[in-house]
Regions:
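Extra-cytoplasmic beta-strand recognition segments
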Residues: 41-47, 82, 86-123, 148-156, ...
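Exposed low-complexity, polar/acidic, P/S/T/G-rich flexible segments that act as propeptides
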Residues: 175-187
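Extracellular glycan-recognition surfaces and repeat-rich motifs
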Residues: 47-81
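Short beta-strand-plus-loop segments that form exposed binding edges in beta-rich domains
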Residues: 165-172
Length: 464
């Protein structure tokens, strides 16, 4: 019954977010009107069969140049659209740019278009802002009539820049843009999240007090370690047993999110489970560890079947547990599914993996460890309390504050989820955007297909 309830809750939340996003696009269009950075956003002032006025076409290799021109297009906003089409070669690559002058204000960048013969919008198209800072559009949704809408909001910097639309790697594809909009928008709100992680192994009687400290520190979310209740596979508890009840009660008492991992008995199966409780004390969902360490399997624990993302009031939360971290696919899949913060309860782990897992997938990571150093990392791989340690990291940090409370075995940090930096943020979103942004990949075909095939190959073959 509880599993069915969780599935229903997840479906309801997903539907609500879909409808809210859809409404937001329409509201944003009206709200941003009158603050345009450049005009002719719908190409109504351009002549058919020509490049649109004010835009410059670039093809680094003329032999691979796509076609860019304005065409008459019934059903578009103005009756016209900007067409980009392949030249018959799979290596086809080129872009069209419009100069803009920006300031230290917040901006909305929006496009609307239709495609034909385009397998993957992220692989075949990019929509970027290049200048003293770089950003772009990384999320799209389907709309009625076959239209696709993409939008992003970002904080600008003073200086000249360019809006760039790129067409790449689609031999016979076509795209018709009927809107390319850039304009000022209301200030982007910060999204501060205060995280508490525990450190060290403790007995069950330690945790009520620890959660009280987290509550008094007014954290948003508190994470305990893997096996925090001190029981092994041979002593599993139901989800509403002592460990689960403690988490629910303290979450409700302090109005915070609470998570931690323990061995859960469910029917005739045992899982290494990490439940997540809401500030109301409600069970939002349970993640069952998918990559079990050998002793767990030998002792009767079963692996989970799914990498999950949970919606909370502050953002999307994913979970990976201990040995999951040794496999980059776990964090990457969470990033692909929209996770912003990954909770990482563990008994022990390799510290050096965390900056890579965070930066590769563009996520924040909170690690609570029983036997290794606990920590909190932002999406650029910067560690709270140690943000300048890596000289090869070239960006700001989204970490707002940090405290290491050894007396209470607790680390807290506040991060701003509205600032998703990558390690080389100056390198441009199409070259160094967080890995969770699929558009970062510049391959002609997805390597995931090869990875999936090779991962399933158990027999030796000659190297190719």
């Amino acid at each position: 019954m509880k599993t069915a309830y969780i599935a229903l809750l997840s479906t309801t939340l997903s539907l609500a977010i879909f409808l809210a996003d859809r409404t937001a696009f329409a509201q944003n269009e009206a709200k941003d009107a009158g603050s345009k950075v450049f005009l002719n956003e719908d190409f109504s002032k351009s002549e058919a069969s020509q490049a649109p006025a004010g835009w410059v076409v670039t093809a680094p290799n003329p032999a691979l140049a796509p076609v860019f021109q304005v065409v008459n297009f019934p059903g578009s906003r103005s009756g016209k659209a900007l067409l980009a089409a392949g030249n018959g070669r799979p290596e086809c690559f080129g872009f069209i740019e419009h100069p803009v002058q920006l300031s230290a204000k917040d901006y909305c960048f929006r496009v609307r278009f239709k495609v034909e013969g385009i397998d993957d919008v992220n692989r075949n198209l990019t929509h970027g802002i290049f200048g003293t800072f770089n950003d772009g559009i990384f999320r799209y949704r389907r709309e009625e009539g076959g239209w696709i809408v993409g939008e992003n909001r970002f904080r600008g910097k003073e200086g000249a820049g360019k809006v760039r639309l790129t067409y790449r790697f689609a031999a016979t594809g076509k795209v018709w843009w009927d809107q390319v909009y850039l304009g000022e928008c209301p200030p982007i709100p910060e999204r501060p999240v205060k995280i508490a992680v525990s450190s060290g192994a403790h007995k069950m009687d330690f945790w009520p007090g620890w959660l009280d400290v987290a509550g008094r520190k007014k954290v948003t979310i508190a994470l305990m370690t893997e096996g925090f209740n001190g029981k092994g596979v041979d002593q599993p508890e139901p989800i509403d047993g002592p460990a689960g009840r403690l988490m629910a009660e303290k979450a409700k008492q302090w109005k915070i999110y609470v998570a931690g991992a323990f061995y859960e008995q469910r029917w005739d199966l045992i899982f290494n489970s990490c439940p997540l409780y809401s500030p109301a004390g409600a069970l939002l969902g349970i993640y069952e560890k998918v990559e079990l360490f050998d002793p767990e399997i030998d002792q009767g624990c079963s692996p989970g079947h799914e990498v999950k993302v949970f919606q909370t009031e502050f953002g999307n939360v994913g979970i990976m547990t201990c040995f999951d971290s040794w496999h980059p696919e776990t964090a990457r899949l969470l990033g692909y599914k929209g996770a912003e913060l990954i909770l990482f309860p563990n008994a022990g782990y390799y510290l050096g993996l965390m900056p890579a897992r965070a930066a590769d997938s563009g996520v924040w990571i909170a690690a609570a460890s029983a036997n290794s150093p606990s920590g909190i990392w932002d999406s650029s791989g910067a560690q709270a309390g140690n943000v300048k340690a890596d000289s090869s990291r070239y960006c700001d940090t989204s970490i707002l504050d940090y405290e290491k409370d050894d007396t209470n075995s607790m680390i807290t940090a506040t991060v701003d989820l509205s600032r998703q930096y990558s390690p080389h943020n100056w390198g441009g979103p199409m070259a160094s955007a967080p890995g969770g942004r699929r558009v970062r990949q510049t391959v002609m075909r997805h390597l995931e297909d090869d990875i999936a095939r090779e991962a399933k190959r158990w027999w030796d073959e000659p190297a190719k």
